[in-house]
Amino acid sequence: MRMEDVDTPRCHEAATQTILSQLAACGMVSDEPVMLQSQRSSAYQTALDALTQTNAVYACRCSRADIARTLAAQGIAAERHRDTPYPGTCRALNLSFEAGMSLRLRVPEGEVHWQDRRLGNQQQNVAVTVGDFVLKRSDGLWAYQLAVVVDDTDQGITHVVRGEDLADNTARQILLQQALGLPQPVYMHTPLVLAADGEKLSKQNGAQSLDTATPEKALQALQAAALVLGLPEIDSDNCASALQHWVNAWPL
């Protein structure tokens, strides 16, 4: 189990405990101590130091407004739900690493290729679509891309199954794995569960949280999820046996 709470100002302990309690009510309990990204700064710093030693990282003083102005001058407009490519303003400036600056990975030119278990052959030119991306933010917080790559390795993750809204993160993570000499997991990106307005179900969009107040309600929540996933209906009176049936029926 891993809690991806690297954005500490937005992630609260109470929310973490609520998630863990809901999972436990549904019969999902971690086999190992829960990993909290908010407590892993030293591991991320070790990875960043390794990248710095190979000149794969540089300091950047650009604000979001600076980047937006530069891109606007180039005729590039920001799009909702899409990364804005960094124009490389600070790449060759050789700035000293100082407080208030972000740290970016020098992204190599060329396509990154990988095989997705559901989407098939995938490729992305990160240098063009994203540019040199942030590893440590100007406010001192670690970026998700670095954190998740380090954590996947430290937890021995061999297969990543996640929503297809994260598919375009994969190429960046592969570049980091290659730069750090880390193993590359097998990836599969699944369809999202959407609300009536087409937005994904998430707390960001105000989706209702699970009601797991009783074992019966927890089982109902699991049954609803199984239905969306196309898993068979089963006659079970508890979460543990239901989960075991669905694990055996999972086709991928």
Predicted regions and their residues:
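Non-catalytic terminal extensions that flank enzyme cores
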Residues: 94, 108-110, 199-252
